[in-house]
Amino acid sequence: MNKNCVEVGKITQARGLKGCVVARIEPILESFDPINYIFIKIGHTLVPYQVEEITGQAQQVFIKFQHISDRDSVRELIGSSIWLSQEILDKLVVQEEPYIDIIGYQVTDKYQGELGIIKDIEQFPLHVCLVVDYLDKELLIPYEPALIQDLDHEQKKIIVELPMGFLEAMGCK
């Protein structure tokens, strides 16, 4: 496997009759230009596929490959992971916000109440997490727009809506 590649998504289904696929993409990509090819993991090998067109936005995109023109040919790719070279990924990654400004903010869950103070920000390859002191444990909360309900810089508070069972899954309850 190529160590200079990063997994960025997964093919979830075929679309239409002309060899197009639907893919879920990590929310790190701002655009898809200029992608001429992607790698698809087949077995233990990354196989390059030439891209004719990528459309869509956010985390769901439609990919049309060159030289594939029927639904049956793409069915075997369903469930396969999508990889990009680090060089291409570096050109496409969304520019990071200055997260350092929110260290010290109080994090409150919409349903669970106060969780704690942000003591650090952890940057992982595909996302950013808030590090919060919660019941003498370190709680990692993904810094995702879908979870953030309100960000009040004046009062230094962040209101989040964590999924049901999140705290239990993190070993905090």
UniProtKB/Swiss-Prot annotation:
Domain of life: Bacteria
GO CC term (a single one): ribosome
Record has Oxidoreductase as a keyword: no
Keyword Isomerase found: no
Swiss-Prot/TrEMBL GO biological process terms: ribosomal small subunit biogenesis; rRNA processing
InterPro entries per record: PRC_barrel-like_sf, PRC_RimM, RimM, RimM_N, RimM_N_sf, Transl_B-barrel_sf
Chain ranges of the PRC barrel domain: 94-166
Subcellular location: Cytoplasm
UniProt keywords, alphabetically: Chaperone, Cytoplasm, Ribosome biogenesis, rRNA processing
GO MF terms, alphabetically ordered: ribosome binding
Pfam families on file: PRC_RimM, RimM
Gene3D superfamilies per UniProt: PRC-barrel domain (2.30.30.240), RimM (2.40.30.60)
Oligomeric form and interacting partners: Binds ribosomal protein uS19.
Protein family per UniProt: Belongs to the RimM family.
Function comment: An accessory protein needed during the final step in the assembly of 30S ribosomal subunit, possibly for assembly of the head region. Essential for efficient processing of 16S rRNA. May be needed both before and after RbfA during the maturation of 16S rRNA. It has affinity for free ribosomal 30S subunits but not for 70S ribosomes.
Record remark: domains: The PRC barrel domain binds ribosomal protein uS19.
Protein name (record): Ribosome maturation factor RimM
Organism encoding this protein: Amoebophilus asiaticus (strain 5a2)
Gene name, Swiss-Prot/TrEMBL: rimM
